Amino acid sequence: MDSVIRALQPYFERIPSVERPKGHVHFREKFGWTAAILLLYFILSNVPVFGLSPESIDIFAAYRALFAGSTGSIIALGIGPIVTASIILQLLVGAGIIKLDLTNPEDRAAYQDFQRFLVFVMIAVEAIPQIAGGLLKPDLNLAAQLGVSPGIISFLIFIQLFIGGVLIVYMDEVVSKWGIGSGVSLFILAGIAQSIVVGLFNWVIPPNSAMPAGIIPRWIWIAQNYPLDQLFTGSGLAFLLIQGGILALITTAAIILLVVFFEGTRVEIPLAHAVARGARGRFPIKLIYASVLPMIFVRALQANVVALGQVLHARGVTIFGEFVNGKAVSGLMFFLQPVSSPYDWIPSLVKSQGAAFAAIPDWMIYLHLLIDALILVVGGIIFAWFWVETSGMDARTVASQIAKSGMQVPGFRKSPQVLERVLSRYIPKVTILGGAIIGILTLVANMLGTIGNVSGTGLLLAVSIAYRFYEDLAKEQLTEMHPLIRRMLGEEA
């Protein structure tokens, strides 16, 4: 397959892309591009899809914090196509089906060009089944008013979703090449931050509920409607912890502190410049070396599988499971859908959601929790390994970059091979350990719940992305000081 990719690369190269800057982009300009794209993202998230029926179902609603975007908007697909394309490529490379040497600049260019092409394919692949499966429904009243068939409205819905997906791709490229960090991370952080703020202060009372959705308004409502002696009983404290949102608040704060701690835990390899006498530094290998981005791939893979089951269920195919209110209640899909709150694994809370949920046996609920734990931990390790190998973070690539900057490990011969041996002592082990830790943290956060229902995965992503964004800001300000620093950090002067 790699020969096919190389043969088709001239055609992939013709796909328009954002041009890379030819020199160093100053910090103010990078910050300006980042802020402009963020503003555009929020504007697009409030542009509704023309002709979409209010009865439509968002199959990615439970993963909205992960995929960014906004339900019912033209960017409803969010970063889903980008993530799905990355998953497919990483699996193909990991399985040896695509045998490209990603340390070779030509092979890496072919890989990236094919990835861009695959993203556009995935935009169509993710939009068409939702429309054809009857989940994204055309507005029949609008079709009657315009005197056109519902099929025409469905086609317009597809065009809008495709345009929105393409805009997300190019907005990501603008941030990655001209801004700070990556667009994917920026969109995730923006969406999760918005959800947390809404989860804290939302005064709106949801349907079938007597309490406001936001935690702070909910506390005020509880204080006005419940006497203290009732709240300080066993059932009252359980009510405050779960329905009152105290457990979600504690979990959110604890996960933030733990992620910051693990992000700051690292092994530092001393470096010295071969020419500039006295110039020394350290190469940090973080405990969460692959960051939490591989966890996106784990959840995205789950989301696509469960979404396929939901599309089939909408077409009357229930062999893989039945869905009620967007949640699987039977079959394979029940075990594969993620745990996102106490209402997904505590039997009494699961069964309180309706008659269909009350019929689920306890053993199925506990087995669902066990399977999700295995998916998170094992999947976190596998995708962390794939991410390191395919994103240029492996020992060989890092050693080559350090050698090109003129740095070496004191007391060792100046050679990329020597550097690679030193780095190989740490990077593979830290990659596996970090992937497992992120999987466990995600599981705990999902089990206990979070503010704004952003899910444990979303919260971990938000904290890690914010931490890395802070580091990127510090790095950008540092590179403004002198061209030599930019060369040592692997940037063009």
From Swiss-Prot:
Instruction: Please list every transmembrane segment annotated in the UniProt record, as residue ranges.
Output: 22-48, 60-88, 110-134, 152-176, 183-201, 245-266, 292-313, 368-387, 431-449, 455-469
Give the SUPFAM superfamilies listed for this entry.
Answer: Preprotein translocase SecY subunit
Question: Where is the protein situated, by its record's location annotation?
Answer: Cell membrane
Where mainly found? membrane
Under Pfam families, the record lists: Plug_translocon (PF10559), SecY (PF00344)
How does this chain sit within the bilayer?
Answer: Multi-pass membrane protein
What keywords is this UniProt entry annotated with? Cell membrane, Membrane, Protein transport, Translocation, Transmembrane, Transmembrane helix, Transport
A Gene Ontology cellular component where this protein is annotated is: plasma membrane
Q: Membrane side Cytoplasmic: which residues?
A: 1-21, 89-109, 177-182, 267-291, 388-430, 470-493
Residues of this chain that stay in the membrane without spanning it are found at 60-67, 68-79, 80-88
Subunit info here reads:
Component of the Sec protein translocase complex. Heterotrimer consisting of alpha (SecY), beta (SecG) and gamma (SecE) subunits. The heterotrimers can form oligomers, although 1 heterotrimer is thought to be able to translocate proteins. Interacts with the ribosome. May interact with SecDF, and other proteins may be involved.
Name of the protein = Protein translocase subunit SecY
Identify the gene encoding this protein: secY
